[in-house]
Amino acid sequence: MAVLGITVALLVWIATLLLVSIWKQIYRSWNLPPGPFPIPFFGNIFQLDLKDIPKSLTKLAKRFGPVFTLHLGQRRIVVLHGYKAVKEVLLNHKNEFSGRGDIPVFQEYKNKGIIFNNGPTWKDVRRFSLSILRDWGMGKQGNEARIQREAHFLVEELKKTKGQPFDPTFLIGCAPCNVIADILFNKRFDYDDKKCLELMSLFNENFYLLSTPWIQAYNYFSDYLQYLPGSHRKVMKNVSEIRQYTLGKAKEHLKSLDINCPRDVTDCLLIEMEKEKHSQEPMYTMENISVTLADLFFAGTETTSTTLRYGLLILMKYPEIEEKLHEEIDRVIGPSRAPAVRDRMNMPYMDAVVHEIQRFINLVPSNLPHEATRDTVFRGYVIPKGTVVIPTLDSLLFDNYEFPDPETFKPEHFLNENGKFKYSDYFKAFSAGKRVCVGEGLARMELFLLLSAILQHFNLKSLVDPKDIDLSPVTIGFGSIPREFKLCVIPRS
């Protein structure tokens, strides 16, 4: 028995050495950037805090430099950290790294829509979507009027709270939801509409779940975890329900489609589908249209909603900043006229606060994963085709040199010595390059106009002492999720 035990131990030891040797050969087969040595099967997963991956990546960057390699499960990942490396990848090598890295929880939609599409259609679908969004007012007066109209409805709903505590999640969220719904579907919801609240609940829940440790682990080990129960199933179910809604809207539009008189973005996409009716390989299928609409609906609602909600929490933490905003609004806009885009140039403090909110909350800290579209030489390293590339946006937004004391909320980060707004090239909250957020112009306009409208009419009142307000996210992964809170809004007149 003793001899058998020694033999088994020896065989295990030899097998381990062989496995490590093979792993080293694979690991060194490319001239990859440096990084921590991966453990077979697990890779570097134990060197990451799944509750705060961005923080773990920052620590690794201090050790291995601004470009380093990780292995997570079977996935090879190159991380870019810091302004120079991130800008170089997103702008100077935008074509080589324009692919979308796999996100297994969205695997079903890998080659459809805009956000998660890594197939042959994504460039054309994205280009056309940008074009029609601009035609329907992206960055122009059309969207300004939409947002101003919705700001009026939002203010009226806030008045109905009569100074009593309320959770702002869905009440505030209805405003950006209605703006994007009008653009996509020529549709506006009442603030108590059951379907609207149901959709926003799906958006909100998914944004939270995507940022939890389980989903982070699932996206690295989906080959094994897909068979287990877990929140990945809930995310997929929610996505399916959202897509069923957009598919229903597309079918509804198709019944009354006039190709000479499009009513909204949905009609524009359907018209393209009609043009391809006899194509052997149509790009605009009903499925692709429904996923594209779902992408735009989710992104156009949840990101702006979360940013506004986080912004209100921050302003309650710093009432002196809120007071300065009231003074600027009263001086430039007054009590009755609707805030307008043209006011931004005369409201540097509000402009700075809006930018600082986006910088400070770090909404999508690690960016969505990119992918190398071909073998690429980058800074002397060879990054093979198919490698996942993560340009960390938080490494720009929290750069100590550009934003002194970056962990503190300071509108002065975007103001010069004369109190004028100061642009920073480090501000890449919407990413950059080929995969920059298609709704950046709309989101910037919404944040400025909606926040200005709220503060024009109301004082914010916290239910706790401002110094006790916790601004740290409840979870951070795919996104930075603010803690739940209630507040009161007190009419100013």
Swiss-Prot record:
Q: Where does substrate bind?
A: F298, A299, G300, T301, E302, T303
EC numbers:
1.14.14.1, 1.14.13.n7
Identify which cofactors the protein needs according to its UniProt entry.
Answer: heme
According to its UniProt record, in which pathway does this protein act?
Answer: Lipid metabolism; fatty acid metabolism
State any single GO MF term: Hsp90 protein binding
Induction / repression: By ethanol and acetone in the liver and by testosterone in the kidney and adrenal tissues.
Xref: Pfam families: p450
- Residue positions binding heme: C437
Where is the protein situated, by its record's location annotation?
Endoplasmic reticulum membrane; Microsome membrane; Mitochondrion inner membrane
Q: Which GO terms describe its biological process?
A: 4-nitrophenol metabolic process; lipid hydroxylation; long-chain fatty acid metabolic process; monoterpenoid metabolic process; response to bacterium; steroid metabolic process; xenobiotic metabolic process
Q: Which UniProt keywords apply?
A: Endoplasmic reticulum, Fatty acid metabolism, Heme, Iron, Lipid metabolism, Membrane, Metal-binding, Microsome, Mitochondrion, Mitochondrion inner membrane, Monooxygenase, NADP, Oxidoreductase
Q: Per the record, what are the reactions this protein catalyses?
A: an organic molecule + reduced [NADPH--hemoprotein reductase] + O2 = an alcohol + oxidized [NADPH--hemoprotein reductase] + H2O + H(+); (5Z,8Z,11Z)-eicosatrienoate + reduced [NADPH--hemoprotein reductase] + O2 = 19-hydroxy-(5Z,8Z,11Z)-eicosatrienoate + oxidized [NADPH--hemoprotein reductase] + H2O + H(+); (5Z,8Z,11Z,14Z,17Z)-eicosapentaenoate + reduced [NADPH--hemoprotein reductase] + O2 = 19-hydroxy-(5Z,8Z,11Z,14Z,17Z)-eicosapentaenoate + oxidized [NADPH--hemoprotein reductase] + H2O + H(+); (4Z,7Z,10Z,13Z,16Z,19Z)-docosahexaenoate + reduced [NADPH--hemoprotein reductase] + O2 = 21-hydroxy-(4Z,7Z,10Z,13Z,16Z,19Z)-docosahexaenoate + oxidized [NADPH--hemoprotein reductase] + H2O + H(+)
Q: How does it sit in the membrane?
A: Peripheral membrane protein
Q: Which domain of life is it from?
A: Eukaryota
* Tissue note: Highest level in the liver and to a lesser extent in the kidney, with a higher level in the male kidney than in the female.
Give any Gene Ontology cellular component: endoplasmic reticulum
Q: EC top class, in one word?
A: oxidoreductase
Q: Where are the transmembrane segments?
A: none
Instruction: Name the principal localization, coarsely classed.
Output: endoplasmic reticulum
- Stated regulation of activity: The omega-1 hydroxylase activity is stimulated by cytochrome b5.
Disulphide bridges in this chain?
A: none
Oligomer status and interactors = Interacts with chaperones HSP70 and HSP90; this interaction is required for initial targeting to mitochondria.
Q: Which family does it belong to?
A: Belongs to the cytochrome P450 family.
Q: What does this protein do?
A: A cytochrome P450 monooxygenase involved in the metabolism of fatty acids. Mechanistically, uses molecular oxygen inserting one oxygen atom into a substrate, and reducing the second into a water molecule, with two electrons provided by NADPH via cytochrome P450 reductase (NADPH--hemoprotein reductase). Catalyzes the hydroxylation of carbon-hydrogen bonds. Hydroxylates fatty acids specifically at the omega-1 position displaying the highest catalytic activity for saturated fatty acids. May be involved in the oxidative metabolism of xenobiotics.
Q: What is this protein called?
A: Cytochrome P450 2E1
Recorded source organism is Mus musculus (Mouse)
Encoding gene (name)? Cyp2e1
